UniProtKB/Swiss-Prot annotation:
It is a multi-pass membrane protein. The modification Phosphoserine is found at S17, S229, S230, S269. The modification Phosphotyrosine is found at Y213. InterPro entries: TMEM192. It comes from Pongo abelii. Keywords: Endosome, Lysosome, Membrane, Phosphoprotein, Transmembrane, Transmembrane helix. This is Transmembrane protein 192. The gene is TMEM192. Belongs to the TMEM192 family. The modification Phosphothreonine is found at T15. Residues 1-46, 115-138, 193-271 are cytoplasmic.
Amino acid sequence: MAAGGRMEDGSLDITQSIEDDPLLDAQLLPHHSLQAHFRPRFHPLPTVIIVNLLWFIHLVFVILAFLTGVLCSYPNPNEDKCPGNYTNPLKVQTVIILGKVILWILHLLLECYIQYHHSKIRNRGYNLIYRSTRHLKRLALMIRSSGNTVLLLILCMQHSFPEPGRLYLDLILAILALELICSLICLLIYTVKIRRFNKAKPEPDILEEEKIYAYPSNITSETGFRTISSLEEIVEKQGDTIEYLKRHNALLSKRLLALTSSDLGCQPSRT
C-alpha cells in the first residue's frame, strides 16, 4: 500500500510538473515559421566581381607595359624617348618593375579578401566548393610570385651583363604576357565554378548528401566504392562536416530559444 501510494504521488508530481511547464503549455509554432527560421539561407559568393576587377587591372597593366616598352625604349632601352619624359628620372624598365610589384601587392590584398569569403562559405557547410577552388586561388598568386622571381633574375643578369639591353626588355615583356595568360586561365576556371555555384543555390553539402541517399537507385552497390580518392580527403571532409554540424546545432538552439521566448511573451498569462 505504501509503495502504491508513492507511485501515485510520483505520477501526480510528474503530471503536475508537466502541467506547470510553460514550454509544453505554449502553442506550437507554425510550420512556415519554423521553415523560415531554421532552413539555412543561401548566401552567394561575392568574389566574382573582385576577380574580374583584378584580371582587368592586370590586363591594363600589361598593355601599358607593352606600349611603354615599345614606344619609349626601342631600339635602345637605355634611352628614354617617351614624350614629355614621363618616366624621368626612372628608366622604363624600372617603372614596369615597380608597377609589377604594386600589382602583386594588390593581388595579395584581394586574395585575403577572397579567402575571407571562402572561409565563411566553408563555415556554412559548403565544403565541396571550398576544396574545389582553393588551389585555383593559390595557383594564381603563385604564378604572379613566380613571375616576380623571374623578373628579379633578369634584373640580376642585366646588372652583371648590361650589353644586350633590348634582350632583357624583350624577356621582361614576354614574362608579363605569359603570366597574364596563365593567370587568365586560372581566374576563368574559378569564375565559371563560382558562377555555377551561385546560380545553383545549393543547400549545405550534408543536406545535399541526404537527398542523394534518400534515393537508393542513385547509389552504387559496388563493394568498397568511394567517391573520394585519398584518406586525407575523407578525414578532412568528415572534420568539416562535424564542425558544420556543431555550429549549425548551436545556431538552431539559439533560434529555437528566441522563437520560444517570443512566443511565450505573446501568450496571455494563466491565472
